[in-house]
Each structure stands twice: as structure tokens, then as C-alpha cells.
Amino acid sequence: MNRREFLKCCSLLGASVALGRTSADAKWLTNEKANGFPQGMLVIDAHAHPDIFPCTDFFCDKTSTLEDIMNIGMNASCFAVVEDENPAGGFQRLIGHLLDVIALEAEGKIKIMRRRSDLPHSSHPPGFTPGAILAVEGATPLETDPNRIDELYDLGVRLITPMHKKINLIGDIMTAVPSNGGLTAVGQQMVERMVSLGIIVDIAHAHINTLQGVAEIARINDVPIIDSHTSLTHRENPYGTTRLRAFEEMEMIAETGGVVCTWPMGWYVDDSHHRTSFLDWAKENLEIAREIGIEHVGLGTDGGGGLPALIDDYESILDLPKLVEAMDEVGFKRSEIAAYMGGNLFRVMKQCIG
């Protein structure tokens, strides 16, 4: 039995034991709440755009806002900026978006997490300031210049999602016919620079052939990678048409020590294939945990990013305590829920950013 098989067996055993609990074992849910979350539970959202995109006549997503992050007592959230639609002048516009987030720190509203010691472990002291993981989604504006990664790092960026909605010089995406054949030579140089600086590499949106190349670099350098916002596909052949991951892909991430983060996106195919409730979300988390280990599953809402559909009764991150309750209902132990809600991502952060 290898390490992966051993961890999987441990996960199955833990889940089976948890499923046998009585309602009395779940009293911690009602007796220790603070702002909706159990007291002391570390909560980190691996992917969100809080107040990043202004509302227009065509788009308005307030599912993650700084106000709600503070009200619910979330320890930290990703603040991901995007500028990959128009390459011309994209890097300078990207810098401008990052400076807008950095201005929030100057106003005392957030604490940008440049090192693990910046994470606020307690979310309710007087004058609480939530942590912010400064992130870039879509590395197209970086073009082929690794020095631009250094510039982002100096600003405080600690997470980069190389791929987004368009195929770029780094690799292929999940939602278009691949044309690069995987991670390119330039892409390899860019990812290696991210890793060397201490930037978390997020392979959300990356096609499986690009994921394979990034995962290989991660294994060689002994660092974890993440997919910050996805869920389990129901398709037998998912590749090229969906943002959802198959177990094969999740396993690649887990083998680096990384985390697959699930989101509140809702969908319905038929009565046997649907994801429409908090209970469905929790059951999916259990299924993934049984396959790759609970230590490799986490939370990433994509709040503010305009998900096309949400599960029922999810309006914003203020509803996340309902997921905690649903995960308890399907059999997760308190320690496992805590790992999912933020502990696993914090482990990745400690290993990557120092």
C-alpha cells in the first residue's frame, strides 16, 4: 500500500465512523457559534473577487463583499483581479487593479497576506481586520516576461491563476479546444518563477494537459498546487467542455499535497445528476474526500465572479454556515469540516509563501 492508498483508506475510515454519530455529537454546531461559524474555526475563501467588479446594467455580483467578509468573521479571502480580455496595455491595467486593492490596506480595511504570519487566527478581536490573499486570475498580461511576476510579488501577489477564459502563451484551458499541447516551454519558465518566489499556483481553468505539466513542476519542487474553484464533473468524458474536474485531475493536485476547492455553483441535468442544494454540495465534498482525502479538499466560492447559477438558498458568503451544517449532516467530523473551511488552504499557504 502506497501513501496515497493509505490516506484514502484513512479518509474512508474516518467518514464511516463519522456517519455513525448521533445528533448529540453535533452540539458544537449550536453551542459554539460566532457570527454563524463555530467558534475558533479558521475560514478562508480560496477564490473570490470581493467588490472587484463594479455593478453595471449587465453585471452585478455581490455574493462576496468586504462588508460581508467582516460581518461573518471570515479570517481571510482571496482578492483576485482580472485583466486578460484585451492584451494591449493589459499589464499596466492589471497593476492598477492591484493598487485599488492595496489601497484598502492603506485604509485599514484589510491585511494583505505577504507571509503566513499575516493571517489573523482570531476573527473577532476588537478592530478585526480580515486577511486578503492578493491574486491574479489569468496570466495573459504577463506575456512571456518572468520579470513581471517579480513585480507582482513585490506588490504582494501570492496567488496566480495562469489560465482563465482564453488560451494563452502558457497553456490550454478547459473550455476550448487545446492548441498548445499542454504547458508550453514559456509556461514552464513562468510557473517555475512563481514557485521559486513563493507564489501559490492555482490551476483553475487549466486543461488536463496543462495541469499535468504544472503538477510535474510542483512535484519536482515539493510544493502544492490548488484548483481554487471547481467541483466534481458528472460527465464520463469531461475534458474540453466544462469547468468541472474528474477524479483523475483531482488526484494530480492531491499528489502534490495540494487542495481542490469547491464552489456553490448549481446545475441540474436530471433527478440522478444535479447539484442544487447545500446537501448536494456537502455530499459531493464527501465523495471527493473519500477519493483523494479530506486533507485535499477546500472552499473556493468565486464570489463576485458571476457564477452562471447558484445552489438553492445560497445568496452570498453569509450563507456558508449552512454548508457547515450540511457537512455535519452527511457525516463529516468537526476536524474535517475545519480542514475544509480553511485549514487545508492554510497548510498550502504555509508551505508556499513561508
Question: What annotation goes with each model-predicted range?
Answer:
Residues 180-215:
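Loop-centered beta-sheet repeat module
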Residues 145-149, 209-220:
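Distinct, well-ordered alpha-helical segments
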Residues 215, 220-231:
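A short alpha/beta connector and helix-capping loop motif
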Residues 105, 190, 198, 205, ...:
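Sec/Tat-exported extracytoplasmic proteins
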Residues 2-20, 25-178, 225, 233-235, ...:
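N-terminal hydrophobic targeting/anchoring segments and the immediately downstream early-domain regions
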